[in-house]
C-alpha cells in the first residue's frame, strides 16, 4: 500500500472519529435544547465538565443562561432561569417534541454550582 493511501486512510479515520465525537457531544444537550424549544425558547446550549459532573448552560436570549446539572438521565435546575423553563414546559406541554429529558427541581439535594460554571454566567 502506498504511503498516500495510508495518509488518506488515516485522515479519513480521524475525520470520522471527530464527527462521531461531535455528534455524541451535541446529542448530550439535544434533548435539553428541544425541551427549551417546546417551552417557547430558541436556546444555544453548551456542556461543561466540572468537579466530575456534567453541567449545561442554555442561553435563551435573556440575561443569564438556564443552568442545568445532569443527574442520571435527568437534568436538575441550577438556577431560577432553568426553573422558569421547567415551569413553562410543564404548562405548555412537549408540543411536537417527543422523548424530552426529565427536568426537575431537586429539593432534597440542592444544586450548588462550582466556580467553573459560575465563571460562565
Please give the residue ranges for each predicted region.
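C-terminal partner/receptor-binding element of secreted or periplasmic proteins
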Residues: 84-121
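Residues at the start of alpha-helices and the adjacent loop-to-helix junctions
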Residues: 1-4, 37, 50
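Short, non-transmembrane alpha-helical segments in secretory-pathway proteins
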Residues: 20-46
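Short, aromatic- and cysteine-enriched interfacial helices/patches
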Residues: 1, 24-25, 117, 121
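Extracytoplasmic/periplasmic/luminal assembly and interaction segments
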Residues: 47-90
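Hydrophobic membrane-insertion alpha-helices, especially the h-region
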Residues: 2-23
Amino acid at each position: 500500500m502506498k504511503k498516500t493511501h495510508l495518509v488518506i486512510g488515516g485522515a479519513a479515520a480521524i475525520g470520522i472519529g471527530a464527527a462521531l465525537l461531535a455528534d455524541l457531544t451535541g446529542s448530550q444537550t439535544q434533548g435539553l435544547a428541544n425541551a427549551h424549544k417546546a417551552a417557547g425558547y430558541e436556546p444555544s446550549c453548551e456542556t461543561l465538565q466540572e468537579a466530575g459532573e456534567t453541567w449545561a448552560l442554555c442561553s435563551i436570549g435573556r440575561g443569564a443562561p438556564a443552568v442545568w446539572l445532569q443527574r442520571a438521565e435527568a437534568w436538575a435546575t441550577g438556577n431560577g432561569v432553568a426553573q422558569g423553563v421547567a415551569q413553562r414546559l410543564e404548562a405548555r406541554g412537549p408540543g411536537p417534541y417527543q422523548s424530552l429529558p426529565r427536568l426537575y427541581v431537586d429539593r432534597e439535594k440542592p444544586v450548588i454550582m462550582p466556580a467553573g460554571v459560575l465563571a460562565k454566567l
